[in-house]
Amino acid sequence: ARRYQLKDGMGDRLTLLNNWENTAFDFDEEKLRHLMDEAKQLGVDMFLLDDGWFGNAHPRNNDDAGLGDWQPNRTKLPNGISSLTRMATKAGVKFGLWVEPEMVNPESELYKKHPDWAITLPGRDTYYYRNQLVLDLSNPKVQDFVFSVVDDIMTENPDIAYLKWDCNSPITNIHSAYLKQKQCNLYIDHVRGVYNVMRRVSEKYPSLPMMLCAGGG
């Protein structure tokens, strides 16, 4: 894997400080600045901002809301992500960011606009992991959206050095509004859709390291 799969797999790995265990969802620019300074003092290479930085109509102050609305929260981060990348540069560390673009909370602008983009089973009680649903990546429009999440972040903040791409829910409520009569194709077409998005991201940002994790690990 190091030789053939990882980017520069035989090279050194960056060490990082993640804010999650310190702040969880409760942070602002000043708290993050202190953590960046402490990361430098510890000799860490990079500071990574985890979950909770996005959502305005449905702020990401807990795991009940906000997934799908990938705009910086104006209360926590009034100056946006770009101010954090500058802050990290001043502190002498690189900056990384958490995303989970395959997922959506029902309490989000995205879900209210496109409920058919989520994998849900009509006529049955909806089953949630971490209060969220999986977006239907068998749908090309959803693939375009998920790619655009990463593309918009990187276009607006080209100094981001690392993405932590999380996945906190398996596929539940198995049904695709897009596939209609081809429900047996959902698992395969969904995975192919994920691979397509990853390929597009990798082709446009070939030097961007990404950690693909599940449940934070």
List PLM regions with ranges.
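Carbohydrate-recognition beta-sandwich/jelly-roll modules
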Residues: 1-12, 36, 40
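Active-site-proximal, well-structured secondary-structure segments within enzyme catalytic domains
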Residues: 8-14, 50-51, 55, 100, ...
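Hydrophobic faces of well-ordered beta-strands that scaffold small-molecule active sites
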Residues: 13-19, 45, 49, 95-99, ...
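Short glycine/proline-rich turn/loop motifs
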Residues: 14-20, 127-132
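Aromatic- and glycine-enriched glycan-recognition loops and surfaces
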Residues: 23-112, 141-145, 189-196
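Active-site neighborhood of glycoside hydrolase catalytic domains
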Residues: 73-90, 111-217
